[in-house]
Design a protein with these regions (language model features):
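N-terminal chloroplast transit peptides
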Residues: 1-16
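Residue-level detector of alpha-helical hydrophobic segments embedded in or interacting with membranes
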Residues: 12-14, 20, 58, 444
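Selective for proline/serine-rich intrinsically disordered segments
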Residues: 15-17, 23, 351
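N-terminal mitochondrial targeting presequences
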Residues: 21, 25-29
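Beta-propeller domains
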Residues: 29-565
């Protein structure tokens, strides 16, 4: 529950959560029941028990023709009226091997776009899916060989002799999707978007008009810039487009980013885009000195773009010499506080950014941000607590970035629990008011939070033991009342991120759409929940014709009106 702090106390009162106690993962007392797919005792539902083989099965490579033909499937229950005629899009890594070689990291997987179109009568859905046919994907598929270096360590065979001084990375187009202004874009935050046909999912090419850099088809290194002109053109440098744009009414708000190594700073440029892809207001630029890691996500309030800067260091030599991928040479700075940047929006009447330090934590996703009646900015994030001694030893100043995600599937025995944080900043005084893992959700392992105007947070829920495990259900946390509502998917099931879709005109609340994989049947389904009654379970379920790998992000394009995510 939000605690309002008086203005006089705001400068002096700082609430921070205590360091997470050392938690030992519980023994999987329910594993025999998981094997049998039988009922699990209530006390064991949220203990995080799972079979590693089940979890690894969610990262089996998907054959290219698995969903190539549109297939109409029956819906159990009824699709709500406001969703009928609309389309759920979901982007994800889906191919994890090439030429008999398994990729080093699931996030290096080739991007796959899923399309689920709901029928007008609410009883059927039509499913199709297709790989994003980037130029590297087509080339590697044709030769059945890994030909490009990847962000998280997958590299062509041949070692340094082949890979040294090759700094161009494969755009895997595997992270998110946006449907806006008649364009469907597959996003990957270290490159340019790829535009797809909204119905057939055929790849049309790179959307290089959205981020400055070399023209489509030319090999380039994005996320780096020197002069923004002739030098960049000669070296093939350019901007990257975020994988996390946000919708604000009739505008799509997004940013591009690029490191400027000679200045040692990260440069962001925010755009607010109309439905015809023109700028609603002039772009806003912002520099972050001494920043090694580009923001993965951002928030938006009436007056500010909100960015949480994670503190990290990078050792470029192993990457340049062809020994490691760029993510492998990143180290999280566990002793340094994060930085919250409040960047004035164009037309806000404000000019000076506000930058406030936050106690050490690592922000993963921004659920939402808003301004209260006193002008303070609230930011809800999912994050790792860097003071957790289980995963961040106190005697180490740095730890590897996403190292435990390598292998056939993310290894939750070595991944920190994702917790919900609420951070409050007073831009008038430039101070941090509070930063906490709110008590009602303390101990809940939550990820992919979404917040709406009613003050409710919906998120994937893994367990209530403060440990790390795959998502096995969903939670709704009411910021105003502190109440928490939960829903458990059942044994051997794994839940993807929720996609939030507003209810129809004249209705309050939201519908929640999610993919859930059942290891017992090796099947994936699309589930629709009422955001006001998530504990009641799905109101509609559409089985997919083929199981799909565990996905990342998606969006919903209604029959009429702008998309939601």
């Amino acid at each position: 529950m939000i605690k309002v702090i008086g203005a006089a106390a705001a400068v002096h009162s700082l609430r921070c959560p205590p360091p997470v106690a050392r938690l030992t993962p519980l023994k999987a007392t329910t594993l025999d029941k998981l094997d049998a797919s039988t009922a699990v005792d209530d006390d064991d539902v949220w203990n995080g028990a799972y079979r590693e083989a089940d979890w690894e099965a969610t990262y089996n490579s998907l054959p290219a023709d698995a969903l190539a033909e549109p297939t109409t499937v029956p819906v159990e229950g009824t699709v709500p009226a406001s969703l009928r005629g609309g389309v759920l899009y979901r982007c994800s890594p889906a191919n994890f091997d090439r030429g008999g070689t398994r990729y080093k990291h699931v996030l290096d997987g080739d991007g796959f776009m899923l399309r689920v179109a709901f029928g007008q009568d609410g009883t059927k859905a039509t499913v199709t899916g297709r790989y994003v046919e980037t130029a590297p994907y087509v080339e590697e598929t044709t030769k059945d060989e890994i030909l490009y270096r990847n962000t998280f360590g997958t590299q062509p065979t041949g070692g340094p002799l082949r890979n040294a001084f090759t700094v161009t990375l494969k755009n895997v187009a595997n992270t998110n999707v946006v449907s806006w202004g008649g364009r469907l874009l597959a996003l990957w935050e270290a490159g340019a978007p790829h535009e797809l046909d909204a119905v057939t999912l055929e790849t049309r090419g790179e959307a290089t008009d959205l981020c400055r850099g070399p023209p489509a088809g030319r090999k380039c290194t994005r996320g780096v810039t020197i002069d923004g002109g002739l030098i960049d053109e000669a070296l093939g440098f350019g901007e990257s487009f975020t994988a996390h744009p946000h919708v604000d009414g009739d505008r799509l708000v997004a940013f591009t980013w690029a490191q400027q190594p000679q200045r040692g700073e990260m440069n962001l440029k925010f755009r607010e885009i109309n439905g015809d892809w023109t700028d609603a207001v002039p772009p806003v630029s912002h520099a972050m000195p001494d920043c090694a890691l580009a923001p993965h996500d951002c928030g938006l309030t009436e007056h500010y773009h909100v960015v949480v800067e994670n503190r990290a260091s990078i050792q470029m030599a192993p990457f340049v010499l062809g020994l490691k991928g760029p993510a492998q040479v990143l180290e999280i700075a566990t002793k340094e506080g994060a930085r919250c940047h409040l960047i004035p929006r164009a037309g806000s009447g404000l000019t000076a950014p506000v930058v406030v330090e936050i106690p050490p934590f690592f922000c993963i996703h921004v659920g939402d941000a808003w301004e209260d009646g006193d002008g303070r900015v609230h930011v809800v994030t999912s994050a790792w607590d860097l003071r957790d001694p289980t995963h961040f030893p106190p005697d180490l100043d740095t730890v590897p970035f996403l190292g435990a995600w390598s292998g056939p599937a993310p290894d939750f025995k070595r991944i920190p629990p994702s917790l919900l944080f609420e951070t409050v900043v007073d831009p008038a005084t430039g101070t941090l008011v509070s930063h906490e893992n709110p008590r009602p959700v303390r101990g809940l392992c939550l990820e992919h939070p979404h917040v709406d105007g009613s003050g409710k947070v919906w998120a994937s829920l893994a367990n209530d033991r403060g440990i790390s495990s795959p998502p096995s259900g969903y939670a709704c946390y009411d910021l105003k009342t502190g109440s928490v509502e939960r829903w458990y998917a059942g044994p051997r099931k794994f839940c993807e991120e929720l996609v939030v879709a507003p209810k129809g005109e004249g209705e309050e609340g939201v519908w929640l759409l999610a993919l859930i994989y059942d290891a017992a049947t090796d099947a994936t389904s699309v589930n629709v929940f009422d955001g006001d009654r998530i504990s009641a379970g799905p109101v509609a379920v559409a089985p997919l014709p083929h199981a799909v790998p565990h996905g990342l992000h998606g969006c919903f394009q209604p029959r009429d009106g702008p998309m939601s995510a």
